[in-house]
A protein has these predicted regions:
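Extracellular/periplasmic catalytic domains that process cell-envelope and extracellular macromolecules
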Residues: 39, 47-49, 60-63, 119, ...
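Proteolytic maturation boundary segments
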Residues: 7-55, 233-277, 319, 418-531, ...
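Non-catalytic, conformational "gating/processing" segments within enzyme and secreted inhibitor domains
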Residues: 160, 212-243, 444-445, 672-704, ...
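Bacterial N-terminal signal peptides
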Residues: 1-6
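Short, conserved secondary-structure transition motifs
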Residues: 164-170, 265-277, 382-393, 591-592, ...
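Histidine-acidic residue clusters that define the catalytic metal-binding segment
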Residues: 28-44, 141, 166, 185-224, ...
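M16 family metallopeptidases and their MPP-like homologs
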Residues: 62-75, 84-88, 102-145, 177-201, ...
Length: 920
């Protein structure tokens, strides 16, 4: 996995602007500043004799622990010709060791650990979060692969195919291709200008000797940081760490002590825009300004500058570009790394807009900021957002450990984020103007334009019915759990009882349901909500209506315009977002504990009193049309749309998707009528988890939502039954300019209330629940190297959902991967699973469930959806026991009843795939 880690209040991915609110809400907030929270309180740093740095922090809010190993090596340590070798090695670290010649993903899965890894510019990191009794086992596995990884010819050849599949997946994205060109021009003499994952040309040439040498040079205790956060005792854990890791010697070939010759970041000589004219759907603009390294004193002011320019609807560039209708969206982030940094702005143009004009407005807006200055109000709002973001991001143990590891790896100081936040608090308006003048000079920037080279055309879709096979594919043997157990480190006995506290439940007189679960572990509140107003209610000729309603809720109410709504939330760093799903509209909210009234009052106002101003509604429609255009150029979006429409007939709720015509047909009166009909208190559920007094929150909800009145019965919708196809159906949607194919295989499934749900969950875990340890993962990804990722799902809801398998493959591997997957389905349908597979899958599901509930966001969603699905209130506690009680006969019966290998729909989107008859 590739990740871009940087010191920024915002991640380096696209930012959805969280709409927000103003003045008369100020009275709800205590203006007295709280004492700054130090996430590094109680962190202990230990240096072992072999040079290993150990960071430990006890957090006893849940019986869960996260173990992470960070290596101070990333793409920064590469050069042309070996670009991507750090990422390739990351993949190889899962292929087994001298002591454990087995895919490590299977070992982590057997522990029920949420484990993964990523490579970035300055580091490579491996992490696992599991129940606390698995702590020692995780330590043993990480120590083993620190020095005993097996890197051989056969394994490398297989994993190089996987990496190339991953890279080709990125190549499908015009944004990725444009960013690669812009970064290469911005850093022509530095490794930061190389793509983190490498290139296909370089990866294909990697030799076993090169990868082994890289491993010996950089994977050594004195180049590593071990981070442990969670429910453990520090003293005894450090003794265990010394026992396991302390005996590892430094590598004799280590390059850790070498003085690295750092290439200076020279001013680019590229003065005109880099223009890519390639197949695609939308025009894109990217701008990169070089910045100083992470330890430079200007970094806090640069972060505040970024928030003023791009964060929220009141920000300067959002107003100038998005609200004006020039752009569909704008995202930005400050990246601060060991040797330099950069500020990246990315803009998606609105239809029929000119990139030169957008670029001109962007430049003028930045120049005008210098000319007019920034206000103290803007600076304070940005500082509050940065601080709230830092606190909210650390609600989860894994994220907290990642912050510590990233800080220590990149800056040499695990306390860096606190120094950075202290710097942010000191930023003045003059500091913001100073960094704009210093770094955002027009002559310093690198600009890239993506201009689609052709008019968008519909995907060329071919449909083939298969009646016989002309190629037989022999799958490997199923994963043997006894082999996993053979190499699994001993697990400490469980010494705690899983008696999870249940939420308090209340129902208002108007039918609104409220679930409250206090949690004082962090001074934050997480809100998850649901309104039964999803896309299933879209008229076929006005598909997209439910989403347009949800997207416009915060565009104005009877008393507040959209800027006022945005301002109230942004000033406190409060997040509130609505998204229409097939079943229901989901509400996601988060705030610091003291700002909960702002969140609740804003939510009530927009849900009850939204007015859908015509100007903002039309702007959102244009954005929806642009997003549709981009979706129809995305193989994953095209594949899932074609897949659903190949299974479900017209007039079925799961068949309907927005089109340009359906979006154009929607009138303002349609939006108002839909909102009036489907947004009702008696179909609304709110779940809150966090630092609050339940009595006070209940009173607040009563006050804000109690007056919400509607008449009549709530609308109900029951999906009609859909027959299975009579034979295998194969569809290939060809998209110009794509190099990686996306495939979906499946058919109709079950609903959440189906008595087979728990057996189906266990069956799915064995079949494709994990891309490294499942049958599909072990065969298609690990043994054959045909895909970067393959998963299966039973997507359930109040109504029957869909069973599907998804994978991404190179076009030359697609047919073989489909054939292999089909054979695995036939095998498990006909012969079932083994008792040892059953027990391993149940343990994995139970452990993953317990780990997920340590994350407040996951906990709030689980509480919410249990209520939405009409499950018993004790489901939060009893889920694990129900999984534990699933029998072998129940799983094998589910395999016979729910897997239909000879009645499957197979859809592939992306490059043309040879339609050879590989499945029957």
């Amino acid at each position: 996995m590739i990740a871009v880690l940087s010191f920024s209040g915002k991640p380096a991915e696209s930012q959805h602007v969280l709409a927000s609110q103003q003045t008369h809400y100020q009275s709800m907030v205590n203006e007295q500043k709280p004492t700054p929270i130090k996430v590094t309180d109680n962190v202990r740093k230990t240096l072992l004799e072999n040079g290993l740095t150990v960071l430990t922090k006890e957090v006893h809010t849940a019986p869960v622990v996260t173990v992470q190993v960070w290596y101070r090596v990333g793409s920064r340590n590469e050069e042309p010709g070996v670009n991507g070798i750090a990422h390739q090695l990351e993949h190889m670290m899962f292929k087994g060791t001298k002591n454990r010649p087995i895919q490590f993903g299977r070992l982590f899965s057997a522990l029920g650990s949420d484990s993964n890894a990523f490579t970035s510019y300055d580091q490579t990191a491996y992490y696992g979060t599991a129940e606390r009794n698995k702590l020692k086992s995780l330590l043993v596995l990480e120590a083993d692969r620190m020095q005993n990884a097996v890197i051989d010819t056969e394994q490398l050849a297989s994993e190089k195919r996987v990496v190339i599949s991953e890279l080709q997946g990125y190549e499908n994205s015009p944004e990725y291709r444009l960013n690669r060109a812009v970064m290469g021009a911005a850093f022509p003499n530095h490794a930061y200008g190389l793509p983190v994952g490498g290139t296909k040309a370089d990866v294909e040439k990697f030799t076993v000797e090169q990868v082994q040498q890289y491993y010996r040079e950089f994977y050594t205790p004195d180049n590593a940081i071990l981070v442990i956060v969670g429910d453990f005792q520090t003293e005894s854990t450090l003794e265990t760490v010394k026992e396991i890791f302390g005996k590892l010697p430094k590598s004799q070939e280590s390059r850790v002590g070498e003085t690295r010759l750092i290439a200076s970041v020279q001013q680019s000589t590229v003065n005109s825009p880099i223009v890519l004219r390639e197949p695609g759907a939308g025009k894109l603009l990217q701008v990169v300004y070089p910045l100083p390294d992470v330890n430079h004193p200007d970094v806090p002011a640069l972060e505040v500058m970024d928030y003023i320019l791009t964060e929220g609807r009141n920000s300067r560039l959002y107003q100038a570009l998005v609200e004006s209708g020039l752009a569909n969206d704008i995202t930005a982030y400050v990246s601060s790394l060991r040797e330099s940094g950069w500020y990246e702005l990315s803009v998606t143009a609105a239809p029929r807009q000119n990139l030169a004009k957008i670029d001109s407005v962007l430049n003028k807006t930045i120049a005008n900021l210098v000319k007019t200055g920034v206000t103290a109000e803007e600076v304070n709002r940005a500082k509050n957002q940065v601080e709230a973001s830092a606190i909210l991001s650390n609600r989860d143990l894994t994220n907290l450990a990642i912050q510590l590891g990233n800080d220590e790896t990149t800056t040499g100081d695990y306390r860096y984020t606190e120094r950075y936040l202290a710097g942010v608090r000191e930023v003045k308006p003059a500091d913001v103007i100073a960094v704009v003048n210093k770094y955002l000079k027009p002559e310093l920037r690198i600009v890239g334009w993506f201009e689609p080279s052709q008019k968008q055309t519909k995907a060329l879709t071919t449909k083939i019915q298969y009646a016989q096979t002309t190629e037989k594919f022999s799958p490997g043997s199923p994963v043997a759990p006894q082999e996993v157990i053979k190499y699994l480190p001993p697990v400490d006995e469980v010494t705690y009882l899983s008696t999870r506290e249940l939420p308090q439940q209340f129902t208002l007189a108007n039918g609104l349901r409220l679930l409250l679960l206090p949690d004082k572990s962090t001074p934050t509140v997480t809100l998850s909500g649901y309104i039964n107003a999803g896309m299933e209610f879209d008229p076929e000729d006005k598909a997209g209506l439910a989403s347009l309603v949800a997207d416009n809720l915060m565009n104005g109410t009877k008393t507040q315009n959209f800027l006022a709504i945005a301002k109230a939330l942004e000033e406190r760093g409060v997040g509130l977002d609505f998204e229409a799903y097939r079943e229901g509209v989901r509400i996601e909210g988060e705030s610091l504990a003291g700002d909960l009234p702002v969140l609740v009052k804003t939510l009530a106002d927009v849900v009850r009193n939204s007015t859908f101003p015509a100007t903002e509604l039309e702007l959102d429609r244009q954005q929806a049309l642009t997003n549709l255009k981009l979706d129809l150029d995305d193989p994953d979006e095209v594949a899932i749309r074609t897949f659903a429409q190949s299974i479900y007939p017209k007039n079925h709720p799961l068949h309907t998707y927005p089109t340009e015509k359906s979006l154009q047909r929607i009138k303002r009166q349609d939006v108002i009528a839909f909102k009036t009909k489907y947004y009702r208190p008696d179909t609304t559920v709110l779940a809150l988890v966090g630092d609050f007094d339940p009595t006070k929150v209940r009173s607040l909800i009563e006050a804000e939502f109690g007056g919400w009145k509607v008449s009549g019965e709530p609308p109900k919708l029951k999906y009609p039954p859909v027959p299975m196809p009579e034979k295998i159906v194969r569809v290939n949607s060809v998209l110009p300019g794509k190099v990686q194919a996306i495939t979906y295989m499946g058919y109709t499934g079950i609903n959440r209330q189906d008595p087979r749900f728990y057996a189906a969950s266990v069956l799915n875990q064995i079949l494709g629940g994990d891309t490294l340890s499942s049958r599909l993962g072990a065969e298609v990804r690990d043994r054959q190297g045909l895909t970067y990722g393959i998963y299966s799902y039973f997507k359930v809801g109040k109504n029957a959902g869909t069973f599907w398998i998804e994978m991404q493959t190179s076009p030359e591997d697609t047919s073989k991967a489909i054939a292999s997957t089909h054979e695995q389905l036939k095998q498990i349908h006909q012969y079932g699973v083994s008792a040892s597979e059953l027990e391993a899958a149940k343990q994995n599901l139970i452990s993953n469930y317990n780990v997920s509930l340590a994350n407040p966001e996951e906990l709030a969603k689980r509480i919410l959806m249990n209520q939405v699905y009409g499950l018993n209130e004790v489901e939060l506690r009893s889920f694990s026991n129900k999984i534990h009680q699933v029998t072998l006969s129940e799983v094998n019966q589910a395999a016979r009843e729910l897997l239909h290998p000879d009645k499957i729909v197979v859809v592939t989107a992306g490059p043309a795939v040879l339609a050879d008859h590989t499945i029957q």
